[in-house]
């Protein structure tokens, strides 16, 4: 099984061009699967049948696996068994009759406009790290980028003259996202004045640097945003993704085209973008209930 799993992971990385984060999720799912099979003395892929898979799923449910995680797990092992059958590592695909559980998508937290403004105005612009943080927050809200995308940004990915940023998303897919005047102003000062002071003796091309002149980490950005959220007295779960959700929702609330928002977010499936239209409708319902005398 180990050999087939490694072959499969190599296949999806090379042929499908999936990101390291996605590959890691697949690897974790397959480890759970392999561990369960080994615990139950199943040593060969052709010994796996539908009943064994259902028992494995029951075990994961008993362990507290959410329906969303379970759906992803089933998707992973289904893809794995299809690969094994296609490459003749196995004589059958035992996942054929396994159904994927439906799960309700949770509506994401979204900041109100005044909360966004309060967050953006929190960093101390007289300090290098404060100016960096303001620029980063402005860019996150202006573009809806994922945290993994912003830490991968190099200086050369930002075109201040043309007013756009080149983003490499999931599966290393490239997209171009426009920049507004405000974020261009912050980026210009940051790149020309602040970043050289943070760079110190290093030669990295990463756009956003920590105080040691190295690229900011994912965890570092999460901590920065959480810290400013507390200072701004925002009583919501605040993550880099909250700014992405807010970017999309505010665009749609102001009449932006759904396809254009899909393109800027880098969603391969428009149904993912449509989730934000439900957020907008829920806000309308909340406002109606609060202010209409007969609600």
UniProtKB/Swiss-Prot annotation:
Family annotation (InterPro entries): CB, DNA_brk_join_enz, Integrase-like_cat_sf, Integrase_catalytic, Integrase_recombinase_N, Integrase_SAM-like_N, Recomb_XerD, Tyrosine_recombinase_XerC/XerD
GO cellular component: a single term: cytoplasm
Keyword terms: Cell cycle, Cell division, Chromosome partition, Cytoplasm, DNA integration, DNA recombination, DNA-binding
GO molecular function: DNA binding; tyrosine-based site-specific recombinase activity
Active site, UniProt feature: 146, 170, 241, 244, 267, 276
GO process annotations (BP): cell division; chromosome segregation; DNA transposition
CDD domains xref list: INT_XerDC_C
Cell compartments where the protein resides: Cytoplasm
Domain Tyr recombinase: 106-289
Disulfide linkage: none
The keyword DNA-binding belongs to this UniProt entry's keyword annotation: yes
Pfam families: Phage_int_SAM_1, Phage_integrase
PANTHER family noted in UniProt: PHAGE INTEGRASE-RELATED, TYROSINE RECOMBINASE XERC
Described function: Site-specific tyrosine recombinase, which acts by catalyzing the cutting and rejoining of the recombining DNA molecules. The XerC-XerD complex is essential to convert dimers of the bacterial chromosome into monomers to permit their segregation at cell division. It also contributes to the segregational stability of plasmids.
Subunit structure, interactors included: Forms a cyclic heterotetrameric complex composed of two molecules of XerC and two molecules of XerD.
Family according to the record: Belongs to the 'phage' integrase family. XerD subfamily.
UniProt name for this protein: Tyrosine recombinase XerD
Species the sequence originates in: Staphylococcus epidermidis (strain ATCC 12228 / FDA PCI 1200)
The gene coding this protein: xerD
